[in-house]
Amino acid sequence: MTERTLILIKPDGVERGLIGEIIARIERKGLKISALDLRVADRETAEKHYAEHADKPFFGELVNFITSAPLIAGVVEGPRAIEAWRQLAGGTDPVAKATPGTIRGDFALEVSTNVVHGSDSPESAEREISIWFPNL
């Protein structure tokens, strides 16, 4: 069964020139990129994306960071795409949970600037894709 997931290469990943490396890892894994867009996220999109964290103390920091500079938003498809992308990305905490060989394990040091985002469930994927790519 083909599954879709949203991926973001966050502003820190774009600024550090990691787009090509990350896209290459996606393609080597066998996933298909069905949408890709370089953009600066507006505040409304960021707040919708992070709505589940709206009551947490770090919400403002998340929104400010994701809207601070260009990012890549994309949709990736394939069998078990959500799990496959999360495996490529590595744990949210790049030092404590992301193993070497993952994107975060190789390229990040802080939770707040951990290079990439990926949906964590089919429901989240559909919600997030509709926020970033409403016409898909």
Swiss-Prot record:
Enzyme class: transferase
Cell compartments where the protein resides: Cytoplasm
InterPro entries associated with the record: NDK-like_dom, NDK-like_dom_sf, Nucleoside_diP_kinase, Nucleoside_diP_kinase_AS
Active site, UniProt feature: H117
Catalytic reaction equation(s): a 2'-deoxyribonucleoside 5'-diphosphate + ATP = a 2'-deoxyribonucleoside 5'-triphosphate + ADP; a ribonucleoside 5'-diphosphate + ATP = a ribonucleoside 5'-triphosphate + ADP
Biological-process GO terms, alphabetical: CTP biosynthetic process; GTP biosynthetic process; UTP biosynthetic process
Cofactor names: Mg(2+)
Keywords for this protein: ATP-binding, Cytoplasm, Kinase, Magnesium, Metal-binding, Nucleotide metabolism, Nucleotide-binding, Phosphoprotein, Transferase
Enzyme Commission code(s) on record: 2.7.4.6
SUPFAM superfamilies according to UniProt: Nucleoside diphosphate kinase, NDK
Coiled coil: none
GO molecular function: ATP binding; metal ion binding; nucleoside diphosphate kinase activity
Any Pfam family the entry gives: NDK
Keyword Metal-binding: yes
Entries under CDD domains matching the protein: NDPk_I
Residues reported in the UniProt entry to bind ATP: K10, F58, R86, T92, R104, N114
GO cellular component: cytoplasm
Function according to Swiss-Prot or TrEMBL: Major role in the synthesis of nucleoside triphosphates other than ATP. The ATP gamma phosphate is transferred to the NDP beta phosphate via a ping-pong mechanism, using a phosphorylated active-site intermediate.
Stored NCBIfam families: PRK00668.1
Subunit structure: Homotetramer.
UniProt record similarity statement: Belongs to the NDK family.
Protein known as: Nucleoside diphosphate kinase
